[in-house]
Regions:
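Conserved active-site segments centered on acidic
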Residues: 2-38
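A short, gly/pro- and small-residue-rich
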Residues: 60-80
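Short glycine-rich anion-binding loops that position phosphate/pyrophosphate groups of nucleotides
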Residues: 9, 56-58
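Short acidic/histidine-rich motifs immediately flanking catalytic phosphotransfer sites
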Residues: 45-50
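Short, well-ordered alpha-helices that flank and scaffold nucleotide-derived cofactor binding pockets
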Residues: 18, 22-25, 66, 93, ...
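Generic structural signal for helix capping and beta-alpha/helix-loop junctions
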Residues: 13, 41-43, 85
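Acidic beta-strand-to-loop metal/phosphate-binding motif
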Residues: 52-54
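Ser/Thr/Gly-rich flexible loops in soluble cytosolic domains mediating phosphotransfer, phosphorylation
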Residues: 3, 74-102
């Protein structure tokens, strides 16, 4: 599954990406997870299965849906607690749930 995380600068989610990759490996899931600044979303959304926004750019959800909906990419804001605690397993589950419901 191709998952893209979008935050303010693309840096703050790097630890979460690592934790998600570890969780995926533990579960035997094949994932491609990369973090980008929100400003790059339009450029990198092609071929993505799920787009996740960091809580700090959650106010951009409506704009993100304008970009993602026409491409059939589900998008939502990562729950604050899971983001803050860098809970890779919960965020990975959140991504899979979004993909399943698209």
């Amino acid at each position: 599954m191709v998952i893209r995380l979008f935050c303010a600068a693309g840096v703050s989610t790097s630890l979460l990406v690592k934790k998600m990759e570890e969780a995926a490996k533990e579960k035997g899931k094949d994932v491609d997870i990369v973090a980008y600044p929100f400003t790059e979303m339009e450029r990198v959304i092609e071929g993505v299965d799920v787009a996740l926004l960091g809580p700090q750019v959650g106010y951009q959800l409506a704009r993100a849906k304008e970009i993602c909906d026409p491409k059939g990419v589900p998008v939502d804001v990562i729950p604050m607690q899971d983001y803050g605690m860098c809970n890779g397993m919960n965020v990975l589950k959140f991504a899979y749930k979004l993909a399943k419901n698209k």
